[in-house]
Amino acid sequence: MQRTTMSYMVATILTLAAVSGISMQSSVQMAHAQLASPACGQVVKGNVTLTANLNCPGDGLIVGGDNTRIDLNGYSITGPGPDSSKVGIVVPNSDLVTVVGPGTVRNFQAGILVTGSDGTNVKRVTFDGNKIAVFMTGTTNTVVEQNLIGPNSIGVAAHSSDMVDVHANLMSSNSLAGVTFVNTDKSTVWANSIGGSANGIFLDSQSDKNSMKFNNVLGNTLDINNADGLALNINDNEFLKNNCNTSNPVGTCVGT
């Protein structure tokens, strides 16, 4: 893809990484009680189950403790729009958090923001109309699996994170990228279907020792982009048996 588009994508992630912490802190100050039926702007912990759709003028739910489980239970959390500074579900400095569908998170700057947390699991959720569907910054051991992701601007983005596991997701029509890693290491993207993006999978030059394998990455402007063509031995990323047509550098697709 064109360098200007790639630069915009990385700049978007870096900007959200800087801004999201401020937005999150102001949101946490909005509410500190826990209700049986969660409401927009609520700080929640423990076992949380949606019993109705949430249409939020601000942030959706803010996790307030370790071992929290949010069950969307077939309902949706809808925000004020992707150009807002609002987040659907915020996971700030809380470990072993699970967000599970079926259910939908849509129309936020970030559908789910995970920051400073370990062991978050996002599973069987639909994301559409967000700037970034799932955004991780400063996390370890985040798992993103079996989700329907798209259309958004970016599907899954990891910034300054380690040991991310992105697998078995269907990503379609995420305009800038399906998966984007910025300064992210020792992570795996495997068995995903990714199409309809400027970049199917993008890794910047500071992301190393990652494994991309067994993915169907087709119908993108550039299916796989390792730091705009950086030689694979420089950042030691592995590309194994990916079904794709176009890559930079060449040779990361099956049969090329």
Question: Predicted regions span which residues?
Answer:
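Secretory targeting signatures
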Residues: 1-34, 50, 70, 122, ...
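N-terminal domain-start segments of secreted/luminal proteins
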Residues: 31-61
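Extracellular beta-strand-rich solenoid/capping regions of secreted or surface-exposed proteins
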Residues: 43, 55-70, 79-98, 106-118, ...
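Structural detector of coil-to-beta-strand junctions
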Residues: 60-62, 86-90, 111-113, 131-134, ...
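Small-residue (G/S/T/A) turn/hinge positions that recur once per unit in extracellular repeat modules
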Residues: 65-68, 75, 94-95, 117, ...
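Consensus "Asn ladder" position of solenoid repeat domains
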Residues: 102-103, 125, 130, 147, ...
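Eukaryotic tandem repeat interaction scaffolds
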Residues: 154-190
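Leucine-rich solenoid repeat scaffolds
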Residues: 209-256
